[in-house]
Each structure stands twice: as C-alpha cells, then as structure tokens.
C-alpha cells in the first residue's frame, strides 16, 4: 500500500477521503455534506490553554454512539495498576517469545512494569507486544492514555479512524487517547509500548541548542483520511480504568470520511533525529537524546521522557566515552531495537529490556569499561544501533508476570562483578 502523510508535529490538519466531505466555515452545520455525522474528539479539556488544546472534528458514516453496552474482556497479561512491591534491584529481561498460537495485538500485550494507574492521570506503563496475526473484525482504543509504540521486529500497519500509518523497526507511532485503530501484520511482530497516563507527549524545549535540533517538527507524519464502509459485526475493545471491555458493533467504526484538527495519530522515523553530542570532552547528560517528553507538574522533571541512543560520532578527547556509572533520581526502563548498546558488551539484546529504578547503581559492565579505558581515542562512529529509554520521575513496579518470567536474567548483577580496586600508589 502506497500511503500518503501530512507532515508537522502538533500541526492543524484537514483532510478528506471523498471530495466535498469537509464542511466549510463551520464545524457542525445543520446538514453535514452527504449526510455525514459530525463528532468532536477532545484530547484536552475545553478550557485548556490554546497551546495545550487538542481536538479533532470527525465526519463519519454513522454516529459512534450507536452501539450496545460493553462487557468485561479477559486479558490477564495486560495490567494498568501496579500494586506489587517496588524493587531497588537491577532487572534485565531477554526477549519474550512470540506465542505459537494465533495472537493479535490486543491479546499479545504483556505488561512488564508501571508506576501509576489509569485513575491518577499520571505515570506510565511499559508493555511489550508479541503478535503473529492481524486483528480481524476487531478494533481497539485506549481511554486510559496515549500509546507510544516502538516496533522491534516486523512492520505494523495501523489502520486508525483518521487514516493509515505504517511503522516498522526504526519508526515509532503514537496513538492518542481514545483514537480507535486496528493493527495488521504480515508475520511475527514484537515491540514495546509506553502507555502514557499523563500529559500528552510533545517536543522538548531546546534551550541554548537554539531553533533547530533533536527531533524536528517537519519529520513527524500524520495520516490522510481513509475510511471503511463495512457493515460487518466488529468487536470493539476498549481499555478503561485499567480493564478491557468489549462490545460488538454492527459495522466498522473506522468510518471517518473527513476530519480536521490537531489531535492525530502520528509516526516518526528515528533515523531523522538530529543527534547532539560533545565535540570537546566528557559525555553529556543523556537528556540530549530526548525525542519526546510528557511533562509533570514539576518543571524540568518529566512524567516520561522518550530517549534514544542512535548512531553517532564519538570524538571526545581524554574522555570515558560510554555512559558513565550513575545513580539517578529518575527511573529508567530501557529497550533495544537493533544492534548493541555501548555500555553493555552482552546480555542486553534486541527485544530485551532492563529496569534501573531511582538510585539503583548502574553503568558499564566490566568488559565495556575495560575496553573504553584502554582504547586509543580517535574519532569513532557508533553505528548499526538503536536503544531507547522510557525515563520517569516515578518508580517502576514490575508485574508479577515479569518477575516470574523465564526471560528475567537472574545473573544480571554479575556484569558488575570483577572490577579491580583502584590503587592509590
């Protein structure tokens, strides 16, 4: 499928899949063209400041309101409340295996950790998805938060109310709270999801960097209008207050013929990130790699930062170039899309994950430290890699499933054993 996109982060778009479907000069005329139904999707309170206000007007074949009551839907691997004890221990997981049984995106979501619940309107949850079939006659939406999807294996086709996005390894996609979508795959697919209960992701402030750098607004892509006119029973599953609920509609809800607004799904190619780094000495703080941020009520302290560690040149003189040893007030959930991470010589592999909570000691392993302290420093490019981090002010609590999983590496702490003691003489 040859898809078209509209470009710009947080831009105001208008698009129609059928000529003349968009009303002119008003949002909800007495008679919408072609008898379509006008519906506003609000992503913020009506009275939110203009620069924070997000909403889109949808013009659809049938009103969304015409459906039966929702009933509970069982999916015990996906959770949104994390009552279990937090742990100060460093945790690392090997990739979880994709099931042999047919499993679509909804049934393939597995929660690893989180630091709030949906009712708080703050915090995040970190999930993985393990998928081998497309969603068929099913549509999903999340009333609890927006979903930042990080594919690691296999391309996803995201068929949304507002159009179609494709996202494979090296891209991310963000689906706003409440937007309905279906996930289609060509084969096995695995990746990560940051479920954000707090303020919507936005671009970070650039400060002294200036007007350009990091993720540039023009590189974000939103879909153009596309719709389904399908009168086939469709199961609509929603996530509401941490639980899944399902109802059968008599048609596909992906029937939006035209829309205008600034609340949209979008995708971003991580290879377009304009990486900032030192050209003199030292390893700057990893905040320079922030792609998107969800702010909290404390300025400069994020509900969640989405950070990447992309290909980049290392040129610092008289410097230990990998990430240094660290104890952080923030908590860090990491994943690896492809390649290797420069602070870990082994064990942290594509599709895996790690968790370092607030003030948990972490840093390079013995092999990486030895190599970095002995290498002859010359300009060097770290290439063929893409790691990422969901960093949050809130401590993550791992799920029972994550702690009991065979993928949990029981020997993770061993990577920091064997450092020789410094000698003062």
Curated annotation (Swiss-Prot):
Residues engaged in binding homogentisate? 341, 362
Q: Which cofactor does it need?
A: Fe cation
Gene Ontology CC annotations of this record: cytoplasm
Active-site residues (renumbered): 283 (proton acceptor)
Q: Catalytic activity annotated for this protein?
A: homogentisate + O2 = 4-maleylacetoacetate + H(+)
Pathway recorded for this protein: Amino-acid degradation; L-phenylalanine degradation; acetoacetate and fumarate from L-phenylalanine: step 4/6
SUPFAM superfamilies in the record, alphabetically? RmlC-like cupins
Keywords, A to Z, come to: Dioxygenase, Iron, Metal-binding, Oxidoreductase, Phenylalanine catabolism, Tyrosine catabolism
Q: Which InterPro entries does the entry link to?
A: HgmA_C (IPR046451), HgmA_N (IPR046452), Homogentis_dOase (IPR005708), Homogentis_dOase_bac (IPR022950), RmlC-like_jellyroll (IPR014710), RmlC_Cupin_sf (IPR011051)
**Quick one: which residues bind Fe cation?**
326, 332, 362
Q: What's the Enzyme Commission number for this chain? A: 1.13.11.5
Q: Which domain of life is it from?
A: Bacteria
Q: Which family does it belong to?
A: Belongs to the homogentisate dioxygenase family.
Task performed by this protein: Involved in the catabolism of homogentisate (2,5-dihydroxyphenylacetate or 2,5-OH-PhAc), a central intermediate in the degradation of phenylalanine and tyrosine. Catalyzes the oxidative ring cleavage of the aromatic ring of homogentisate to yield maleylacetoacetate.
Q: How does it assemble?
A: Hexamer; dimer of trimers.
Q: What is this protein called?
A: Homogentisate 1,2-dioxygenase
- Which organism is this protein's natural source? Caulobacter vibrioides (strain NA1000 / CB15N)
């Amino acid at each position: 499928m040859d898809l078209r996109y509209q470009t710009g982060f947080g831009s105001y778009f208008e698009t129609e899949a059928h000529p003349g479907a968009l009303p002119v000069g008003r949002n909800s005329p007495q008679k919408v063209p072609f008898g379509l139904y006008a519906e506003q999707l609000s992503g913020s309170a009506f009275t939110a400041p203009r620069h924070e206000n997000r909403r889109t007007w949808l013009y659809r074949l049938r009103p969304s309101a015409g459906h039966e009551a929702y009933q509970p839907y069982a999916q015990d691997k996906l959770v949104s409340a994390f009552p279990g004890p937090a742990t100060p221990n460093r945790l690392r997981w090997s990739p979880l295996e994709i099931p042999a049984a047919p499993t679509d995106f909804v049934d393939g979501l597995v929660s690893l950790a989180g630091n709030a619940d949906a009712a708080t309107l703050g915090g995040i949850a970190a999930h993985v998805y393990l998928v081998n079939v497309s969603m068929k006659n099913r549509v999903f939406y999340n009333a609890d938060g927006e979903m930042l999807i990080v594919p690691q294996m296999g391309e996803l086709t995201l068929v949304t109310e507002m159009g179609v996005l494709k996202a494979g390894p090296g891209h991310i996609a963000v689906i706003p709270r409440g937007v309905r979508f279906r996930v289609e795959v060509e084969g096995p697919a695995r990746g990560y999801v940051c479920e954000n209960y707090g303020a919507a992701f936005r671009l970070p402030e650039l400060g002294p960097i200036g007007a350009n750098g990091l993720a540039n607004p023009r590189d974000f892509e939103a879909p153009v209008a596309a719709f389904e006119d399908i009168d086939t029973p469709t199961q609509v599953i929603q996530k509401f207050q941490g639980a899944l609920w399902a109802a059968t509609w008599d048609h596909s809800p992906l029937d939006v013929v035209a829309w205008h607004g600034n609340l949209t799904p979008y995708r971003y190619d991580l290879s377009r990130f304009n990486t900032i780094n030192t050209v003199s000495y030292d390893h700057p703080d990893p905040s320079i790699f922030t792609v998107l941020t969800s702010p909290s009520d404390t300025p400069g302290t994020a509900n969640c930062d989405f950070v990447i560690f992309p290909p980049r040149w290392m040129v610092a003189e008289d410097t230990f170039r990998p990430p240094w040893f660290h104890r952080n007030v923030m908590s860090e959930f990491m994943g690896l899309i492809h390649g290797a991470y420069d602070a870990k010589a082994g064990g942290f592999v594509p599709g895996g994950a790690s968790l370092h909570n607030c003030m948990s000691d972490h840093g390079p392993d013995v092999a990486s430290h030895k190599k970095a302290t002995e290498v002859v420093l010359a300009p060097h490019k770290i290439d063929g890699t893409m790691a990422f981090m969901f960093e949050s002010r809130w401590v993550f609590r791992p799920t029972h499933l994550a702690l009991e999983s065979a993928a949990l590496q029981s020997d993770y702490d061993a990577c920091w054993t064997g450092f020789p003691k410094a000698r003062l003489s």
